[in-house]
Amino acid sequence: MKRVLRGALIPALVFLLWEAGSRADLLPMDTLSRPSDIAVALAGGFVDGSILLATWQTVQAALSGFAIAAAAGILVGAILGLSPPIERTVGPSIEALRPIPAVALTPLTLLLFGFGLRMEAGVVAFACVWPILLVTVAAVRGIEPRLLEVAQILRLGFAARLRKIILPAALGRIVVGLRVALSISLIVAVTVEILMNPRGLGYGMIIASQSLKPDLMYAQLLWLGFLGWGLNAALTRAFGSWHGAFGPGVRP
Amino acid sequence: MSVPPLLSLAGVSVSFGSPADGHEVLSEISFDVPDGEFLCIVGPSGCGKTTLVRLLAGLLAPSGGQILFQGRPLAGTSRDRAIVFQDYSKALLPWRTVAGNIALSLEACGIAEPERSERIGALLAKMRLEPAAARFPSQLSGGMQQRVQIARSLAQQPKLLLMDEPFGALDAITRQDLQDEIARLVAENRTTVVFITHDLEEAIYLGDRVIVLAAEPGRIAEMIEVGIPRPRDQLETREDRRFLEHRHRLFGLLQGH
Protein backbone atom coordinates (compact mmCIF):
# COMPACT_ATOMS: atom_id res chain seq x y z
CA MET A 1 0.00 0.00 0.00
CA LYS A 2 2.84 2.30 0.90
CA ARG A 3 4.46 1.54 -2.46
CA VAL A 4 1.25 2.36 -4.32
CA LEU A 5 1.02 5.71 -2.56
CA ARG A 6 4.65 6.45 -3.32
CA GLY A 7 4.13 5.56 -7.00
CA ALA A 8 1.03 7.80 -7.18
CA LEU A 9 2.95 10.81 -5.85
CA ILE A 10 4.29 12.12 -9.18
CA PRO A 11 1.05 11.74 -11.19
CA ALA A 12 -0.87 13.47 -8.39
CA LEU A 13 1.64 16.30 -8.35
CA VAL A 14 1.45 16.69 -12.15
CA PHE A 15 -2.35 16.87 -12.09
CA LEU A 16 -2.27 19.35 -9.23
CA LEU A 17 0.20 21.68 -11.01
CA TRP A 18 -1.73 21.24 -14.24
CA GLU A 19 -5.01 22.21 -12.57
CA ALA A 20 -3.41 25.15 -10.81
CA GLY A 21 -1.62 26.28 -13.98
CA SER A 22 -4.78 26.30 -16.08
CA ARG A 23 -6.80 28.06 -13.35
CA ALA A 24 -4.10 30.75 -13.27
CA ASP A 25 -4.39 31.05 -17.10
CA LEU A 26 -0.79 29.93 -17.54
CA LEU A 27 -1.78 27.01 -19.81
CA PRO A 28 -3.64 27.17 -23.16
CA MET A 29 -7.16 25.91 -22.45
CA ASP A 30 -7.93 24.90 -26.08
CA THR A 31 -5.21 22.18 -26.09
CA LEU A 32 -4.60 21.43 -22.41
CA SER A 33 -7.95 20.93 -20.72
CA ARG A 34 -8.18 21.19 -17.00
CA PRO A 35 -7.90 17.90 -15.10
CA SER A 36 -11.23 18.70 -13.44
CA ASP A 37 -12.88 19.08 -16.87
CA ILE A 38 -11.25 15.84 -18.01
CA ALA A 39 -12.61 14.05 -14.94
CA VAL A 40 -16.08 15.43 -15.71
CA ALA A 41 -15.81 14.30 -19.36
CA LEU A 42 -14.64 10.85 -18.29
CA ALA A 43 -17.48 10.51 -15.78
CA GLY A 44 -19.93 11.70 -18.45
CA GLY A 45 -18.63 9.11 -20.88
CA PHE A 46 -19.19 6.40 -18.30
CA VAL A 47 -22.64 7.64 -17.38
CA ASP A 48 -23.93 7.76 -20.97
CA GLY A 49 -22.15 4.47 -21.74
CA SER A 50 -20.20 5.81 -24.74
CA ILE A 51 -16.77 5.10 -23.22
CA LEU A 52 -17.84 1.66 -22.07
CA LEU A 53 -19.05 0.76 -25.56
CA ALA A 54 -15.89 2.12 -27.20
CA THR A 55 -13.76 0.23 -24.66
CA TRP A 56 -15.60 -2.98 -25.38
CA GLN A 57 -15.09 -2.50 -29.13
CA THR A 58 -11.37 -1.79 -28.81
CA VAL A 59 -10.67 -4.55 -26.30
CA GLN A 60 -12.74 -7.03 -28.27
CA ALA A 61 -10.73 -6.36 -31.44
CA ALA A 62 -7.39 -6.36 -29.60
CA LEU A 63 -8.07 -9.59 -27.74
CA SER A 64 -9.61 -11.42 -30.73
CA GLY A 65 -6.58 -10.57 -32.84
CA PHE A 66 -4.25 -11.49 -29.99
CA ALA A 67 -5.98 -14.85 -29.44
CA ILE A 68 -5.77 -15.75 -33.14
CA ALA A 69 -2.09 -14.75 -33.17
CA ALA A 70 -1.33 -16.74 -29.99
CA ALA A 71 -2.96 -19.93 -31.26
CA ALA A 72 -1.34 -19.70 -34.70
CA GLY A 73 2.03 -18.46 -33.43
CA ILE A 74 2.45 -21.16 -30.78
CA LEU A 75 1.32 -24.02 -33.02
CA VAL A 76 3.38 -22.99 -36.06
CA GLY A 77 6.29 -21.97 -33.84
CA ALA A 78 6.34 -25.36 -32.13
CA ILE A 79 6.35 -27.18 -35.47
CA LEU A 80 9.12 -24.97 -36.88
CA GLY A 81 11.15 -25.31 -33.68
CA LEU A 82 10.91 -29.09 -33.74
CA SER A 83 11.67 -29.57 -37.42
CA PRO A 84 14.70 -27.81 -38.90
CA PRO A 85 13.82 -28.93 -42.48
CA ILE A 86 10.36 -27.34 -42.25
CA GLU A 87 11.91 -24.25 -40.69
CA ARG A 88 14.36 -23.96 -43.59
CA THR A 89 11.46 -24.20 -46.05
CA VAL A 90 9.03 -21.83 -44.35
CA GLY A 91 11.52 -19.50 -42.67
CA PRO A 92 12.37 -17.33 -45.72
CA SER A 93 8.68 -16.70 -46.43
CA ILE A 94 8.20 -15.63 -42.83
CA GLU A 95 11.15 -13.28 -43.07
CA ALA A 96 9.62 -11.78 -46.23
CA LEU A 97 6.20 -11.19 -44.64
CA ARG A 98 7.35 -10.04 -41.22
CA PRO A 99 8.77 -6.62 -42.18
CA ILE A 100 5.44 -5.47 -43.67
CA PRO A 101 4.08 -2.86 -41.23
CA ALA A 102 0.85 -4.37 -39.92
CA VAL A 103 -0.99 -1.06 -40.22
CA ALA A 104 -0.21 -1.05 -43.96
CA LEU A 105 -2.55 -4.02 -44.27
CA THR A 106 -5.50 -1.89 -43.16
CA PRO A 107 -6.63 -1.07 -46.74
CA LEU A 108 -6.38 -4.74 -47.69
CA THR A 109 -8.38 -5.96 -44.69
CA LEU A 110 -10.92 -3.24 -45.41
CA LEU A 111 -11.41 -4.72 -48.88
CA LEU A 112 -11.61 -8.21 -47.43
CA PHE A 113 -13.86 -7.63 -44.43
CA GLY A 114 -15.29 -4.09 -44.66
CA PHE A 115 -15.41 -1.80 -41.61
CA GLY A 116 -15.83 -3.42 -38.23
CA LEU A 117 -14.43 -5.99 -35.86
CA ARG A 118 -13.03 -8.45 -38.40
CA MET A 119 -10.79 -6.04 -40.29
CA GLU A 120 -9.39 -4.64 -37.05
CA ALA A 121 -8.80 -8.05 -35.48
CA GLY A 122 -7.13 -9.20 -38.70
CA VAL A 123 -4.59 -6.37 -38.61
CA VAL A 124 -4.00 -6.95 -34.90
CA ALA A 125 -3.44 -10.69 -35.48
CA PHE A 126 -0.90 -9.96 -38.23
CA ALA A 127 1.00 -7.60 -35.96
CA CYS A 128 0.92 -9.95 -32.94
CA VAL A 129 1.78 -13.23 -34.58
CA TRP A 130 5.46 -12.47 -35.24
CA PRO A 131 6.80 -11.97 -31.74
CA ILE A 132 4.87 -15.04 -30.55
CA LEU A 133 6.04 -17.16 -33.48
CA LEU A 134 9.71 -16.19 -33.22
CA VAL A 135 9.85 -16.58 -29.46
CA THR A 136 8.14 -19.98 -29.67
CA VAL A 137 10.61 -21.25 -32.29
CA ALA A 138 13.54 -20.18 -30.10
CA ALA A 139 11.93 -21.55 -26.93
CA VAL A 140 11.22 -24.96 -28.46
CA ARG A 141 14.75 -25.14 -29.87
CA GLY A 142 16.16 -24.24 -26.48
CA ILE A 143 14.49 -27.13 -24.65
CA GLU A 144 16.96 -29.27 -22.76
CA PRO A 145 17.71 -32.18 -25.17
CA ARG A 146 17.77 -34.55 -22.20
CA LEU A 147 14.03 -33.99 -21.71
CA LEU A 148 13.35 -34.92 -25.33
CA GLU A 149 15.41 -38.09 -24.82
CA VAL A 150 13.34 -38.93 -21.75
CA ALA A 151 10.25 -38.56 -23.93
CA GLN A 152 11.86 -40.78 -26.54
CA ILE A 153 12.78 -43.50 -24.01
CA LEU A 154 9.21 -43.44 -22.68
CA ARG A 155 7.93 -43.52 -26.27
CA LEU A 156 5.52 -40.62 -25.85
CA GLY A 157 3.51 -39.86 -29.01
CA PHE A 158 3.64 -36.42 -30.65
CA ALA A 159 0.57 -35.06 -28.87
CA ALA A 160 1.76 -36.30 -25.46
CA ARG A 161 5.25 -34.99 -26.10
CA LEU A 162 3.85 -31.57 -27.01
CA ARG A 163 1.52 -31.44 -24.00
CA LYS A 164 3.70 -33.01 -21.32
CA ILE A 165 7.22 -31.95 -22.30
CA ILE A 166 7.54 -29.34 -25.05
CA LEU A 167 4.89 -26.77 -24.11
CA PRO A 168 5.56 -26.76 -20.36
CA ALA A 169 9.30 -26.57 -20.99
CA ALA A 170 8.92 -23.71 -23.49
CA LEU A 171 6.02 -21.83 -21.88
CA GLY A 172 8.20 -19.72 -19.61
CA ARG A 173 9.82 -18.14 -22.66
CA ILE A 174 6.66 -18.11 -24.80
CA VAL A 175 5.02 -15.92 -22.14
CA VAL A 176 7.59 -13.23 -22.93
CA GLY A 177 6.38 -13.19 -26.54
CA LEU A 178 2.75 -13.17 -25.41
CA ARG A 179 3.33 -10.11 -23.24
CA VAL A 180 5.02 -8.21 -26.05
CA ALA A 181 2.18 -9.20 -28.39
CA LEU A 182 -0.50 -8.13 -25.92
CA SER A 183 0.84 -4.60 -25.70
CA ILE A 184 1.17 -4.50 -29.51
CA SER A 185 -2.46 -5.65 -29.84
CA LEU A 186 -3.83 -2.59 -28.07
CA ILE A 187 -1.55 -0.20 -29.98
CA VAL A 188 -2.54 -1.64 -33.35
CA ALA A 189 -6.25 -1.79 -32.54
CA VAL A 190 -6.30 1.90 -31.59
CA THR A 191 -4.18 2.82 -34.60
CA VAL A 192 -6.57 1.10 -37.01
CA GLU A 193 -9.47 2.92 -35.34
CA ILE A 194 -7.71 6.26 -35.68
CA LEU A 195 -6.82 5.53 -39.32
CA MET A 196 -10.20 4.51 -40.62
CA ASN A 197 -12.26 2.06 -38.60
CA PRO A 198 -15.25 3.95 -37.17
CA ARG A 199 -15.44 2.23 -33.78
CA GLY A 200 -13.67 2.01 -30.46
CA LEU A 201 -11.60 4.41 -28.38
CA GLY A 202 -9.28 5.43 -31.23
CA TYR A 203 -12.21 6.64 -33.30
CA GLY A 204 -13.71 8.29 -30.22
CA MET A 205 -10.51 10.28 -29.70
CA ILE A 206 -10.37 11.41 -33.31
CA ILE A 207 -13.98 12.58 -33.15
CA ALA A 208 -13.38 14.38 -29.83
CA SER A 209 -10.31 16.08 -31.22
CA GLN A 210 -11.99 17.12 -34.49
CA SER A 211 -15.03 18.48 -32.67
CA LEU A 212 -12.70 20.53 -30.42
CA LYS A 213 -13.44 18.66 -27.20
CA PRO A 214 -9.92 18.19 -25.82
CA ASP A 215 -11.27 17.23 -22.38
CA LEU A 216 -13.07 14.21 -23.84
CA MET A 217 -9.99 13.32 -25.88
CA TYR A 218 -7.79 13.44 -22.77
CA ALA A 219 -10.35 11.44 -20.83
CA GLN A 220 -10.20 8.64 -23.40
CA LEU A 221 -6.41 8.83 -23.62
CA LEU A 222 -6.01 8.43 -19.86
CA TRP A 223 -8.56 5.65 -19.83
CA LEU A 224 -6.63 3.90 -22.62
CA GLY A 225 -3.41 4.08 -20.61
CA PHE A 226 -5.18 2.59 -17.62
CA LEU A 227 -6.58 -0.16 -19.86
CA GLY A 228 -3.12 -1.13 -21.18
CA TRP A 229 -1.75 -1.24 -17.67
CA GLY A 230 -4.66 -3.42 -16.56
CA LEU A 231 -4.25 -5.90 -19.43
CA ASN A 232 -0.56 -6.32 -18.72
CA ALA A 233 -1.16 -6.69 -14.99
CA ALA A 234 -3.81 -9.36 -15.67
CA LEU A 235 -1.40 -11.33 -17.85
CA THR A 236 1.43 -11.03 -15.34
CA ARG A 237 -0.89 -12.24 -12.63
CA ALA A 238 -2.20 -15.18 -14.67
CA PHE A 239 1.28 -16.41 -15.55
CA GLY A 240 2.76 -15.39 -12.23
CA SER A 241 0.77 -18.15 -10.59
CA TRP A 242 1.80 -20.49 -13.39
CA HIS A 243 5.48 -19.73 -12.72
CA GLY A 244 4.73 -20.88 -9.20
CA ALA A 245 4.39 -24.41 -10.55
CA PHE A 246 8.16 -24.51 -10.77
CA GLY A 247 8.53 -24.17 -7.06
CA PRO A 248 9.94 -21.18 -5.26
CA GLY A 249 12.83 -19.34 -6.75
CA VAL A 250 12.86 -21.18 -10.05
CA ARG A 251 12.30 -19.40 -13.32
CA PRO A 252 12.32 -21.38 -16.57
CA MET B 1 19.48 -75.96 -24.71
CA SER B 2 20.66 -72.76 -23.11
CA VAL B 3 18.57 -69.67 -22.39
CA PRO B 4 19.47 -66.86 -24.82
CA PRO B 5 21.01 -63.80 -23.13
CA LEU B 6 18.79 -60.79 -22.52
CA LEU B 7 21.23 -58.61 -24.44
CA SER B 8 23.83 -59.60 -26.95
CA LEU B 9 26.35 -57.48 -28.84
CA ALA B 10 28.35 -58.89 -31.74
CA GLY B 11 31.09 -56.84 -33.43
CA VAL B 12 29.39 -53.54 -32.72
CA SER B 13 31.14 -50.40 -33.91
CA VAL B 14 30.22 -46.72 -34.06
CA SER B 15 31.86 -44.08 -36.24
CA PHE B 16 30.99 -40.44 -36.51
CA GLY B 17 31.69 -38.50 -39.68
CA SER B 18 32.09 -39.81 -43.22
CA PRO B 19 33.09 -43.47 -43.84
CA ALA B 20 36.40 -42.32 -45.36
CA ASP B 21 37.75 -40.07 -42.63
CA GLY B 22 35.24 -40.95 -39.90
CA HIS B 23 36.22 -41.00 -36.28
CA GLU B 24 35.76 -44.47 -34.79
CA VAL B 25 34.32 -44.18 -31.29
CA LEU B 26 33.61 -47.85 -30.58
CA SER B 27 35.29 -50.77 -32.29
CA GLU B 28 34.35 -54.46 -32.37
CA ILE B 29 32.41 -54.57 -29.11
CA SER B 30 31.05 -58.04 -28.33
CA PHE B 31 29.54 -59.25 -25.07
CA ASP B 32 26.40 -60.91 -23.71
CA VAL B 33 24.36 -59.90 -20.70
CA PRO B 34 22.40 -62.78 -19.16
CA ASP B 35 19.09 -62.13 -17.45
CA GLY B 36 19.51 -60.80 -13.91
CA GLU B 37 23.15 -59.81 -14.22
CA PHE B 38 24.64 -56.60 -12.85
CA LEU B 39 27.25 -55.67 -15.45
CA CYS B 40 29.57 -52.75 -14.84
CA ILE B 41 31.44 -51.07 -17.68
CA VAL B 42 34.36 -48.95 -16.63
CA GLY B 43 36.73 -46.93 -18.76
CA PRO B 44 38.72 -43.73 -19.00
CA SER B 45 37.07 -40.62 -20.40
CA GLY B 46 36.76 -40.66 -24.17
CA CYS B 47 36.44 -44.45 -24.41
CA GLY B 48 32.86 -44.26 -25.69
CA LYS B 49 31.06 -45.26 -22.48
CA THR B 50 28.22 -42.84 -23.05
CA THR B 51 28.01 -43.79 -26.72
CA LEU B 52 27.66 -47.43 -25.66
CA VAL B 53 24.81 -46.68 -23.26
CA ARG B 54 23.02 -44.63 -25.94
CA LEU B 55 23.34 -47.60 -28.29
CA LEU B 56 21.80 -49.92 -25.72
CA ALA B 57 18.99 -47.45 -25.05
CA GLY B 58 18.22 -47.24 -28.77
CA LEU B 59 18.95 -43.51 -28.92
CA LEU B 60 21.72 -44.23 -31.43
CA ALA B 61 22.12 -46.88 -34.12
CA PRO B 62 25.43 -48.74 -34.53
CA SER B 63 27.51 -48.20 -37.68
CA GLY B 64 28.38 -51.90 -37.79
CA GLY B 65 27.68 -55.17 -36.02
CA GLN B 66 24.50 -56.34 -34.37
CA ILE B 67 22.71 -55.81 -31.06
CA LEU B 68 20.09 -58.32 -30.01
CA PHE B 69 17.65 -57.63 -27.17
CA GLN B 70 15.57 -60.61 -26.09
CA GLY B 71 16.76 -62.36 -29.23
CA ARG B 72 15.52 -59.65 -31.61
CA PRO B 73 17.53 -56.88 -33.30
CA LEU B 74 17.40 -53.77 -31.17
CA ALA B 75 15.82 -50.89 -33.10
CA GLY B 76 14.88 -47.60 -31.47
CA THR B 77 13.87 -47.00 -27.91
CA SER B 78 11.60 -49.20 -25.84
CA ARG B 79 9.95 -48.90 -22.43
CA ASP B 80 11.59 -52.26 -21.65
CA ARG B 81 14.89 -50.42 -21.40
CA ALA B 82 15.08 -47.56 -18.90
CA ILE B 83 17.97 -45.17 -18.56
CA VAL B 84 19.24 -43.17 -15.61
CA PHE B 85 21.29 -40.20 -16.79
CA GLN B 86 24.16 -38.66 -14.86
CA ASP B 87 22.76 -35.13 -15.10
CA TYR B 88 19.65 -35.68 -13.00
CA SER B 89 18.80 -31.98 -12.89
CA LYS B 90 18.39 -31.88 -16.67
CA ALA B 91 16.54 -35.18 -16.90
CA LEU B 92 13.77 -34.33 -14.41
CA LEU B 93 10.81 -32.14 -15.35
CA PRO B 94 11.28 -29.00 -13.24
CA TRP B 95 7.58 -28.12 -13.40
CA ARG B 96 6.45 -31.43 -11.93
CA THR B 97 6.72 -32.54 -8.33
CA VAL B 98 8.61 -35.67 -7.31
CA ALA B 99 5.39 -37.68 -7.52
CA GLY B 100 4.57 -36.01 -10.84
CA ASN B 101 7.93 -36.94 -12.31
CA ILE B 102 7.41 -40.58 -11.36
CA ALA B 103 3.89 -40.35 -12.77
CA LEU B 104 5.30 -39.44 -16.19
CA SER B 105 6.59 -42.99 -16.69
CA LEU B 106 3.30 -44.50 -15.57
CA GLU B 107 1.34 -42.16 -17.88
CA ALA B 108 3.57 -43.24 -20.76
CA CYS B 109 2.91 -46.89 -19.89
CA GLY B 110 -0.84 -46.18 -19.93
CA ILE B 111 -1.39 -46.95 -16.25
CA ALA B 112 -4.52 -45.16 -15.02
CA GLU B 113 -5.71 -44.19 -11.57
CA PRO B 114 -6.07 -45.62 -8.98
CA GLU B 115 -3.25 -48.02 -9.84
CA ARG B 116 -1.01 -45.10 -10.79
CA SER B 117 -1.20 -43.55 -7.32
CA GLU B 118 -0.62 -46.92 -5.68
CA ARG B 119 2.49 -47.53 -7.71
CA ILE B 120 3.78 -44.01 -7.11
CA GLY B 121 3.27 -44.57 -3.39
CA ALA B 122 5.14 -47.88 -3.49
CA LEU B 123 8.07 -46.36 -5.41
CA LEU B 124 8.24 -43.35 -3.09
CA ALA B 125 8.45 -45.73 -0.15
CA LYS B 126 11.01 -47.94 -1.83
CA MET B 127 13.26 -44.99 -2.72
CA ARG B 128 12.66 -43.30 0.67
CA LEU B 129 11.21 -40.26 -1.07
CA GLU B 130 7.89 -40.09 0.78
CA PRO B 131 8.59 -36.83 2.63
CA ALA B 132 9.57 -35.19 -0.67
CA ALA B 133 6.59 -36.37 -2.74
CA ALA B 134 5.03 -32.93 -3.15
CA ARG B 135 8.29 -31.04 -3.60
CA PHE B 136 9.89 -29.89 -6.83
CA PRO B 137 13.27 -31.19 -8.06
CA SER B 138 14.89 -27.79 -7.54
CA GLN B 139 14.07 -28.05 -3.84
CA LEU B 140 15.96 -31.34 -3.43
CA SER B 141 19.60 -32.26 -2.96
CA GLY B 142 21.47 -33.95 -5.80
CA GLY B 143 21.22 -37.34 -4.16
CA MET B 144 17.46 -36.97 -3.72
CA GLN B 145 17.04 -35.84 -7.33
CA GLN B 146 18.93 -38.89 -8.52
CA ARG B 147 16.66 -41.08 -6.37
CA VAL B 148 13.70 -39.50 -8.19
CA GLN B 149 15.22 -40.35 -11.55
CA ILE B 150 15.87 -43.93 -10.44
CA ALA B 151 12.28 -44.18 -9.17
CA ARG B 152 10.99 -42.87 -12.50
CA SER B 153 13.07 -45.47 -14.35
CA LEU B 154 11.87 -48.30 -12.12
CA ALA B 155 8.27 -47.12 -12.62
CA GLN B 156 8.37 -48.27 -16.23
CA GLN B 157 9.30 -51.77 -14.95
CA PRO B 158 12.17 -52.20 -17.37
CA LYS B 159 13.73 -55.54 -18.26
CA LEU B 160 17.06 -53.75 -18.59
CA LEU B 161 18.14 -50.78 -16.49
CA LEU B 162 20.86 -48.65 -18.06
CA MET B 163 22.78 -46.33 -15.77
CA ASP B 164 25.16 -43.76 -17.26
CA GLU B 165 27.58 -42.69 -14.51
CA PRO B 166 24.57 -42.12 -12.27
CA PHE B 167 26.54 -41.25 -9.14
CA GLY B 168 29.38 -39.36 -10.86
CA ALA B 169 28.13 -35.94 -9.80
CA LEU B 170 27.42 -36.85 -6.15
CA ASP B 171 29.55 -36.51 -3.05
CA ALA B 172 31.30 -39.61 -1.67
CA ILE B 173 28.89 -40.31 1.20
CA THR B 174 25.74 -39.91 -0.92
CA ARG B 175 27.36 -42.05 -3.58
CA GLN B 176 27.97 -44.92 -1.14
CA ASP B 177 24.37 -44.70 0.11
CA LEU B 178 23.00 -44.87 -3.40
CA GLN B 179 25.36 -47.70 -4.36
CA ASP B 180 23.96 -49.85 -1.56
CA GLU B 181 20.46 -48.74 -2.37
CA ILE B 182 20.68 -49.69 -6.05
CA ALA B 183 22.29 -53.04 -5.16
CA ARG B 184 19.41 -53.77 -2.78
CA LEU B 185 16.70 -52.70 -5.27
CA VAL B 186 18.19 -54.71 -8.09
CA ALA B 187 18.48 -57.79 -5.88
CA GLU B 188 14.82 -57.38 -4.84
CA ASN B 189 13.50 -56.89 -8.38
CA ARG B 190 15.97 -59.19 -10.16
CA THR B 191 16.47 -56.40 -12.73
CA THR B 192 19.27 -56.71 -15.26
CA VAL B 193 21.59 -53.70 -15.06
CA VAL B 194 24.27 -52.25 -17.30
CA PHE B 195 26.07 -49.70 -15.15
CA ILE B 196 28.57 -47.29 -16.71
CA THR B 197 31.17 -45.64 -14.49
CA HIS B 198 34.65 -44.17 -14.54
CA ASP B 199 35.22 -45.36 -10.96
CA LEU B 200 36.94 -48.76 -10.89
CA GLU B 201 36.15 -49.46 -7.24
CA GLU B 202 32.49 -48.65 -7.81
CA ALA B 203 32.44 -51.08 -10.73
CA ILE B 204 33.96 -53.94 -8.71
CA TYR B 205 31.81 -53.17 -5.67
CA LEU B 206 28.52 -53.23 -7.62
CA GLY B 207 29.11 -55.64 -10.49
CA ASP B 208 28.73 -59.36 -10.99
CA ARG B 209 31.05 -58.77 -13.90
CA VAL B 210 33.22 -55.83 -14.95
CA ILE B 211 34.17 -54.90 -18.50
CA VAL B 212 37.09 -52.50 -18.87
CA LEU B 213 37.11 -50.36 -22.00
CA ALA B 214 40.23 -48.89 -23.58
CA ALA B 215 40.10 -45.61 -25.50
CA GLU B 216 40.87 -44.47 -29.07
CA PRO B 217 38.95 -46.30 -30.34
CA GLY B 218 36.75 -47.61 -27.55
CA ARG B 219 37.23 -51.37 -27.31
CA ILE B 220 37.05 -54.10 -24.69
CA ALA B 221 40.40 -54.36 -22.87
CA GLU B 222 39.44 -56.86 -20.20
CA MET B 223 36.47 -58.68 -18.73
CA ILE B 224 36.40 -60.19 -15.22
CA GLU B 225 33.96 -62.08 -13.02
CA VAL B 226 33.89 -60.35 -9.65
CA GLY B 227 32.86 -63.45 -7.68
CA ILE B 228 32.36 -61.70 -4.33
CA PRO B 229 29.15 -62.89 -2.63
CA ARG B 230 26.23 -60.55 -1.95
CA PRO B 231 25.11 -58.67 0.02
CA ARG B 232 28.26 -56.64 -0.07
CA ASP B 233 29.46 -54.19 2.52
CA GLN B 234 31.14 -50.82 1.99
CA LEU B 235 33.90 -51.67 4.50
CA GLU B 236 34.39 -55.41 4.33
CA THR B 237 33.91 -55.89 0.60
CA ARG B 238 36.43 -53.17 -0.17
CA GLU B 239 38.96 -54.97 2.06
CA ASP B 240 38.18 -58.39 0.58
CA ARG B 241 41.20 -60.14 -0.95
CA ARG B 242 39.36 -60.66 -4.27
CA PHE B 243 38.32 -56.99 -4.41
CA LEU B 244 41.93 -55.89 -3.99
CA GLU B 245 43.18 -58.38 -6.55
CA HIS B 246 40.69 -57.14 -9.15
CA ARG B 247 41.57 -53.60 -8.33
CA HIS B 248 45.31 -54.24 -8.76
CA ARG B 249 44.79 -56.12 -11.98
CA LEU B 250 42.48 -53.59 -13.64
CA PHE B 251 44.07 -50.41 -12.29
CA GLY B 252 46.87 -50.40 -14.85
CA LEU B 253 44.44 -50.77 -17.75
CA LEU B 254 42.72 -47.52 -16.83
CA GLN B 255 45.86 -45.45 -16.78
CA GLY B 256 45.52 -44.95 -20.54
CA HIS B 257 49.01 -44.53 -21.99
Give residue ranges: language-model regions.
Chain B
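Helix-to-loop junction immediately C-terminal to a conserved catalytic motif
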Residues: 57
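A short, proline-enriched helix->beta-strand linker immediately N-terminal to the Walker B motif
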Residues: 155-159
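Conserved ABC ATPase "signature" region
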Residues: 107, 112-132, 184
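Conserved ABC ATPase signature
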Residues: 136-140, 144
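The feature captures the beta-strand-to-loop junction immediately N-terminal to the Walker
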Residues: 42-44
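Q-loop/switch helix immediately C-terminal to the Walker
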Residues: 96-107
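Conserved ABC transporter NBD signature motif
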Residues: 65-77
